[in-house]
Design a protein with these regions (language model features):
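Charge-dense, helix-prone N-terminal extensions
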Residues: 3-4, 8-142
Length: 142
């Protein structure tokens, strides 16, 4: 039996039995819930599987695009995606590793997030580190 309980952040639910890499699975009902979860946990966790509803299902969920933007604001990046069932997929999110490359797509997204005033101190710190060591000026092309 899978036990799910409300996490410390409103709108996010944490699955207590973790996938094999021992990261929790959380479900956030919207972008605000994902942002609240990261605000509370970005320094405490080494990663998480975010359960995202597939578009055709119309289930209340943070969207993939929203999740990427919010993750970047907090210095986290998306990684591997796994199919889960007919309704959801799992997207792995982790804090950006030191010296990890920035994609041209994420550089452009972050510039928009800065202009919109959405970036948070942890995300800005990742940008500063990338600018300091040259990764910002030579983003990877995907």
């Amino acid at each position: 039996m899978t036990v799910v309980r409300q996490d410390e952040s409103a709108g996010c639910f944490r699955k207590l039995d973790a996938v094999r890499d021992e990261l929790d699975i959380i479900t956030c009902t919207d972008a605000g819930a994902w942002e609240a979860w990261l605000a509370a946990n970005h320094r405490l966790r080494r990663g998480v599987w975010l359960k995202i509803a597939k578009q055709r299902t119309r289930v209340a969920s943070v969207t993939n695009d929203e999740a990427v933007d919010v993750g970047l604001c907090w210095g986290w990046i998306s990684g591997h995606r796994k199919a889960l069932d007919d309704t959801y997929f799992l997207q792995r999110y982790t804090p950006r590793r030191p010296r990890s490359n920035w994609s041209a797509v994420n550089v452009a997204k972050v510039e928009e997030l800065i202009a919109d005033g959405r970036m948070q101190p942890p995300g800005l710190a990742e940008i500063d580190a990338a600018k300091a060591d040259g990764r910002w000026e030579r983003p990877a092309r995907l």
